[in-house]
Design a protein with these regions (language model features):
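Short gly/pro/ser/thr-enriched loop/turn and capping motifs at secondary-structure boundaries
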Residues: 49-50, 137-140, 228
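PAPS-dependent sulfotransferases, especially Golgi type II membrane carbohydrate sulfotransferases
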Residues: 1-17, 144-147, 153, 175-186, ...
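PAPS-dependent sulfation machinery
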Residues: 32, 36-116, 123, 149-161, ...
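PAPS-dependent sulfotransferase catalytic domain
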Residues: 57, 62-63, 101-223, 233-245
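Short, solvent-exposed turn/loop segments enriched in Gly/Ser/Thr/Pro and often Arg
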Residues: 21-23, 45-49, 231
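Beta-sheet entry/capping signal
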Residues: 16, 39, 128-129
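Walker A (P-loop) phosphate-binding motif
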Residues: 11-34
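Short hydrophobic segments within beta-strands
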Residues: 18-20, 43, 132
Length: 290
């Protein structure tokens, strides 16, 4: 029996906005701002990007196999596979993304698919993307807190808590994301907005208004201001935020007090070039964002 056709009235490709960034970079907060302030329908972490993760694994671990033209996503087949993936992703969006009526667009929050963002944007040449960039040191400090026993994430993670493992895994992930971001800037030039978390914290309304302008999303400033106020960290009740909670501190630069000296050294040694290239200050060096 053939499958039923996808429903009509879904989101066209040019109204799809992917939200990428390392987990704990503020993508959830941004998602609320997009939904409440810019009227985008939010699709929270469908893990669509994860289906492409095997391509990166093959490229890293078996480069000869990755180059083999019999591999359907090899470079030799690049004239073909983006169209196939486009058909797949747009069908999934049509079937599961819901109706486009009454929404300015569909925001797909996919932090766990960030490492394959370039592949997604190659396959969806009309879609837009937001990349949330936050100081990796604050991100890693947040992940350590989240993984501790008794924390919101620690209760869901089976493996025993190990600070060193969390730091090392995060560094490796940031290295992959750094390479992916460079590729994404080329692949999605003109339809990519790099949202710096520290700027979003300083001027939330101004950054969101600028994002809407750059990506061509309609913006009612009164609605946006109300959304900014509604979703401000300061508005969250004290019992719902703090150490061990999903919403922690939203503090910029807290890593200096929260990370151990050896962890900071390891991060600077392995991610120093990325930090400098994105304007983040390394103590003892001149310039950059604090």
């Amino acid at each position: 029996m053939p499958f039923p056709p996808a429903p009509q009235g879904g989101f066209p490709e040019d109204r799809v906005v992917w939200v990428f960034g390392h987990p704990r970079s503020g993508t959830t907060w941004l998602g609320h701002l997009l939904a409440d302030g810019l009227n985008l329908k939010m699709w929270n972490e469908p893990y669509l990007g994860q289906v492409l993760g095997f391509a990166n694994l093959l490229r890293d671990n078996e480069p000869a196999r990755f180059q083999d033209p019999t591999f359907w996503m090899s470079e030799q087949q690049e004239a073909h596979w983006p169209a196939s993936l486009n058909t797949f992703f747009m069908d999934v969006i049509a079937r599961q993304g819901g109706a486009a009526k009454d929404h300015a667009g569909l925001a797909i929050k996919e932090p766990n698919g960030t490492v394959v963002a370039p592949l997604l944007l190659k396959a969806l040449p009309q879609a837009k993307a937001i990349f949330v960039l936050r100081d990796p040191r604050d991100v890693i400090a947040s992940l350590i807190d989240a993984r501790k026993p008794g924390s919101w994430m620690g209760e869901r993670v089976a493996e025993e808590f190990n600070r060193t493992r969390v730091v090392n895994q995060s560094i490796k992930r940031f290295q992959r994301i750094a390479a992916g971001l460079q590729e994404l800037e080329q692949t999605a030039a003109g339809r990519l907005y790099e949202m710096v978390y520290e700027r979003l914290r300083t001027d939330t309304f101004g950054e969101m208004r600028h994002l809407a302008h750059v990506l061509g999303i309609p913006c009612d400033e009164a609605v946006l201001r109300a959304a900014v106020d509604k979703n401000a960290y300061e508005r969250i009740p004290a019992e719902r935020k703090g150490p061990g909670k999903f919403v922690r501190t939203a503090r910029v630069g807290g890593w200096q007090e929260e990370l151990e000296p050896g962890e900071i050294t390891a991060i600077h040694r392995q991610l120093g070039d990325f930090l400098r290239s994105r304007g983040y200050e390394i103590p003892g060096e001149a310039g950059g964002r604090p």
